[in-house]
């Protein structure tokens, strides 16, 4: 009962983060569930779905399939969908049922690739972890599979060759903002390229915020190699290995950036560009007033905001807390992970003169509603309630 939530809803699950990280890619996504997890993702956790749907399907897993371990039906259905849609990639995404029954998601992906010739990845999400871990797994799988390689070297199978040739004659798919952010077929750029890793709607909320993030990065005089904020192709992921640097804008991008740094020597910069931050220092005028300020959000986003406040001259104590993963290298002495609601309730009781910035639903917690605060909607916490 330690994880019981009385005041806050369940947070976005790891399979949601995995699907969100794949949204910008021409990827056939199969969520291995009975349909509930898929519905939860498209209706509550993916704000882009309302304006632009993707090839994301439920496996419609039946009880007998799960109990008897009948993978053949799932594989056949996936191959049929791949033959029809001819995607550049296939992802088999796990949920609680395959996790509990021990289904070999990676093995299924291997069989699908062997039969189709289309690169396939198995994402061992379980539904028991939160969104940033699923997104991180996907980005690492993509970086491990494609970075430093060439799309032309991908294996071809029974109908994989037809899929590749069909995609080669099609222009890059439209980006979330109506432009083209898929760089695989674009002309070589004279500008240095950078990677933008970890940008998902669970942290940035809207299509407009993701578009603005990419625009802000381009203002620095660079072009994008692999950006998870817009559309991308396996070719873009391949070019990530030659990028000037990786800009990590959330926890979800840290592991993939470290992989690129260790394997290809691509340096990483952790932090959200100031102009793309969910809030600006002026928004805090009159709020802090020498009070300790608690920022509750994704750790990378919250730390970026803290740095902006310090640069603007805010002298009050600034602490970062998160319900989600926190990296030891970014933690300062007053920062802390939020184990459950009681962590924040205890903090409020111990710090009667504090202010906070975070999702509006935090105002439900005892000690938070009557405290000065700034609203920073976090889609992973409150879905689309405040977007």
Predicted segments with their positions:
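An N-terminal assembly and electron-transfer interface module characteristic of large anaerobic redox
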Residues: 1-387
């Amino acid at each position: 009962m330690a994880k019981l939530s009385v005041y806050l809803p369940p947070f976005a699950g790891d399979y949601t983060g995995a699907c969100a990280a794949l949204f910008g890619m021409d990827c056939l996504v199969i969520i291995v569930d009975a349909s509930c997890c898929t519905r939860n993702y498209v209706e509550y956790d993916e704000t882009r779905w309302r304006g632009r749907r993707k090839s994301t399907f439920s496996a419609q897993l039946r009880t007998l399939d799960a109990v008897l371990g009948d993978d053949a039906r799932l594989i056949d259905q996936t191959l049929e969908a791949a033959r029809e849609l001819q995607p550049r990639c296939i992802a088999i995404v796990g949920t609680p049922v395959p996790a509990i029954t021990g289904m070999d998601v990676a093995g299924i992906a291997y069989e699908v690739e062997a039969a189709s010739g289309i690169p396939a990845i198995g994402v061992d999400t379980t539904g028991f972890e939160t969104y940033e871990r699923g997104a991180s797994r996907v980005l690492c799988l993509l970086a491990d599979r494609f970075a430093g390689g060439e799309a032309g070297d991908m294996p071809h199978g029974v109908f994989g060759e037809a899929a590749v040739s069909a995609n080669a004659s099609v222009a890059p798919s439209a980006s979330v903002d109506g432009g083209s952010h898929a760089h695989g077929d674009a002309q070589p750029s004279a500008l240095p390229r950078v990677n933008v890793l970890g940008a998902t709607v669970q942290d940035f909320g809207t299509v407009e915020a993701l578009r603005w993030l990419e625009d802000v990065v381009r203002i620095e005089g660079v072009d994008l190699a692999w950006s998870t904020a817009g559309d991308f192709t396996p070719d873009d992921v391949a070019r990530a290995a030659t990028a000037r640097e990786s800009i990590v804008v959330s926890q979800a991008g840290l592991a993939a950036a470290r992989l690129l740094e260790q394997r290809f020597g691509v340096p990483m910069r952790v932090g959200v560009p100031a102009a793309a931050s969910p809030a600006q220092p002026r928004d805090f005028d009159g709020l802090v007033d020498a009070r300790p300020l608690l920022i509750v959000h994704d750790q990378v986003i919250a730390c970026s905001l803290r740095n902006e406040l310090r640069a603007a001259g805010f002298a009050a104590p600034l602490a970062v807390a998160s319900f989600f993963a926190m990296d030891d290298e970014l933690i300062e002495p007053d920062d802390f992970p939020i184990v459950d609601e009681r962590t924040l309730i205890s903090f409020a009781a111990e710090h009667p003169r504090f202010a906070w910035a975070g999702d509006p639903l935090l105002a439900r917690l005892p000690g938070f509603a009557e405290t000065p605060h700034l609203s920073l909607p976090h889609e992973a916490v409150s879905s689309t309630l405040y977007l």
